[in-house]
């Protein structure tokens, strides 16, 4: 079985521009720093709240749901695992589209379910037909690693096609123009999954959550690990949620840099699929040279993400960093252009 392979993590002090894991380039809210300063180390001998009630209440108030409609986990990876563990027994069907987050396929393999893989291709405008008899379907919106996003109305059409649970993986929703939260109110089979890793600059804290109908969230609570969110994580995320001003400012900066960098790259002749996430899928003019492009960037101390998968071998996924980081990347793209021009 092929497992999930994360992006390369350089050692401390290594002089790379790290743009391969879709981390937020800005620090967390100052309120997080204050919580860390005030945390009593003696408290770490105690187990955390097993149901993360304060977090769920804060998230519910922020997003317009009750705490009973929310479950928290050790990152959205944990939430995705809980979903498969809860709703798809061995031999039943888990559906997803590719290209997409590789963990979907891995989770299906681990739990012995049948992976039903639907292929989508550029320009990614036409949604796939969803089989009626699936137990569970994962749809990443915005898509990773490509970055395109569907409007809520189009996602609703897809969700209505299946009798199973339709999961909208919104790991990058805060960077997009639209999200699918309204579908949780309107459709009984929709669950939305989110994370604080990207938007709140808390990838190291590991907190993901699902929002859905109470009856489905209650089932998920039955299969989650007993203490799956640490005391420290619950404290720092609660603090970050109180600081929406920092969130909005950083999201705005990333979106602005994304737009500028996309325009400049395209003007050089690089191909970019319009992105609604905190990354872009960047392709040199010459097709089929994604791995060489990745290696050329790596040699110049720029870490991107290459996927040796169908539909992804023409380019790399590149996180949007700070403006000065992306200016350096743009300079490298200019230097590399003669090597990757179409024949």
Task: Show where each model-derived region lies.
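N-terminal "arm"/small-domain region of PLP-dependent enzymes with the aminotransferase-like
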Residues: 1-46, 132-133
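Active-site phosphate-binding strand-loop segment of PLP-dependent enzymes
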Residues: 116-174
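A short linear hydrophobic-aromatic micro-motif
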Residues: 68, 192, 268-271, 302-307
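Phosphate-binding glycine-rich loop
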Residues: 53-93, 111
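Conserved PLP-binding catalytic core of the aspartate aminotransferase-like
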Residues: 255, 267-300, 316
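PLP-dependent aminotransferase class I/II
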Residues: 51, 189-266, 270-273
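PLP-dependent aminotransferase-like
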Residues: 86-140
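PLP-dependent enzyme catalytic core of the Aspartate aminotransferase-like
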Residues: 153, 296-300, 305, 309-343
């Amino acid at each position: 079985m092929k497992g999930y392979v994360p992006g390369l993590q350089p050692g401390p002090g290594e002089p790379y521009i790290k743009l391969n894991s879709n981390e937020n380039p800005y620090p967390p809210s100052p309120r997080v720093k204050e919580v860390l300063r005030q945390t009593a180390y003696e408290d770490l001998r105690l187990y955390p709240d097993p149901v993360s009630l304060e977090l769920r209440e804060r998230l519910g108030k922020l997003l317009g749901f009750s705490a009973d409609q929310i479950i928290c986990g050790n990152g959205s990876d944990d939430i995705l695992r809980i979903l498969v563990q809860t709703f798809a027994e061995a031999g039943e069907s888990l559906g997803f589209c590719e290209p997409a987050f590789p963990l979907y396929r891995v989770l299906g393999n681990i739990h012995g379910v049948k992976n039903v893989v639907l292929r989508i291709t550029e320009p990614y405008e036409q949604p796939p037909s969803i089989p009626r008899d699936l137990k569970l379907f994962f749809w990443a919106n915005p898509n990773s690693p490509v970055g395109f996003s569907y409007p809520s109305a189009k996602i609703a059409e897809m969700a209505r096609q299946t009798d199973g649970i339709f999961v909208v993986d919104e790991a990058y929703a805060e960077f997009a123009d639209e999200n699918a939260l309204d579908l949780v109110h309107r459709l009984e089979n929709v669950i939305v999954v989110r994370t604080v890793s990207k938007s709140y600059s808390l990838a190291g804290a590991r907190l993901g959550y699902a929002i859905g109908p109470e009856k489905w969230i209650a089932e998920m609570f039955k299969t989650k690990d007993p203490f799956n969110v640490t005391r420290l994580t619950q404290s720092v995320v609660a603090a970050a949620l109180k600081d929406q001003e920092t969130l909005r400012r950083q999201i705005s900066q990333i979106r602005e840099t994304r737009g500028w960098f996309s325009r400049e790259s395209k003007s050089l002749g690089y191909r970019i699929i319009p992105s609604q996430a905190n990354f872009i899928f960047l392709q040199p003019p010459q097709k089929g040279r994604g791995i060489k492009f990745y290696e050329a960037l790596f040699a110049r101390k720029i870490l991107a993400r290459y996927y040796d998968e169908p539909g992804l071998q023409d380019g790399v996924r590149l996180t949007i960093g700070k403006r000065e980081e992306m200016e350096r990347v743009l300079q490298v793209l200019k230097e590399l252009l003669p090597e990757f021009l179409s024949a």
